[in-house]
Amino acid sequence: MTEEARRIVIEHAVEGTRLRESYFNGNADKVVDGARRMAVTLAKGHKLLFCGNGGSAADAQHLAAEFVNRFQMERPPLPAIALTTDTSIITAIGNDYSFDQIFEKQVQALGNEGDMLVGISTSGNSPNVVRAMHAARERGLATMGLTGRGGGEMAGLCDILFDVDHGRTALVQEVHITIGHLLCGLTDHFLFENVLALQPWLKDATNA
């Protein structure tokens, strides 16, 4: 291994560690709140929808899998759908209408009032994710966003926004999946280990 290659590894790891430490020091309460919102959504019999492009599509599928299968603890499957996986649906919409509508039309077909849409976009401006957010709000879904660079257009469309304001997309993505893992673990915690903590929100739908 050359010294230059080793330096690249260490610098990336150090910068990523600093970013995660800084982000979670400032946003730990927001992550807990996001997980509580997810838990309330699921406890009320609703579902989670995920969408994103490229690496964010992979994150959407990753997180949906953690909910449907399990994360760390043994528990019943939880309803979550990644809108990035059905190539027939995606190519039909993209071919007949527009790539910008591939998630929007799925939200219109699958999303119901009380569900939650989680949109992932490192720019916050992916047109198909933005349109999906608009569709979700029109149908009465809660909206959560994982973004970078200030949140972009998604900032004004999300009930709760996790914006990792950093210039390197790769590091933003690394924090996104850490946020996602924490949301999975904390949602399980609220649903199966600390159910009493959810009671105030289960009684009062306006706070969910």
From Swiss-Prot:
Record PROSITE patterns: SIS (PS51464)
Domain SIS positions: 38-200
Cofactor(s) needed: Zn(2+)
Pfam families the UniProt entry points to: SIS_2
Binding site for Zn(2+): 62, 66, 173, 181
Molecular function via GO: carbohydrate derivative binding; D-sedoheptulose 7-phosphate isomerase activity; zinc ion binding
Source organism superkingdom: Bacteria
Enzyme class: isomerase
Keywords for the protein's UniProt record, in alphabetical order: Carbohydrate metabolism, Cytoplasm, Isomerase, Metal-binding, Zinc
Pathway(s): Carbohydrate biosynthesis; D-glycero-D-manno-heptose 7-phosphate biosynthesis; D-glycero-alpha-D-manno-heptose 7-phosphate and D-glycero-beta-D-manno-heptose 7-phosphate from sedoheptulose 7-phosphate: step 1/1
Keyword field contains Plastid: no
GO biological process, one term: carbohydrate metabolic process
Enzyme Commission number(s) of this protein: 5.3.1.28
GO CC entries: cytoplasm
Compartments it resides in: Cytoplasm
Additional notes on this entry: The reaction produces a racemic mixture of D-glycero-alpha-D-manno-heptose 7-phosphate and D-glycero-beta-D-manno-heptose 7-phosphate.
Subunit text: Homotetramer.
Stated name of the protein: Phosphoheptose isomerase
Organism name: Nitratidesulfovibrio vulgaris (strain ATCC 29579 / DSM 644 / CCUG 34227 / NCIMB 8303 / VKM B-1760 / Hildenborough)
Organism ancestry: Bacteria, Pseudomonadati, Thermodesulfobacteriota, Desulfovibrionia, Desulfovibrionales
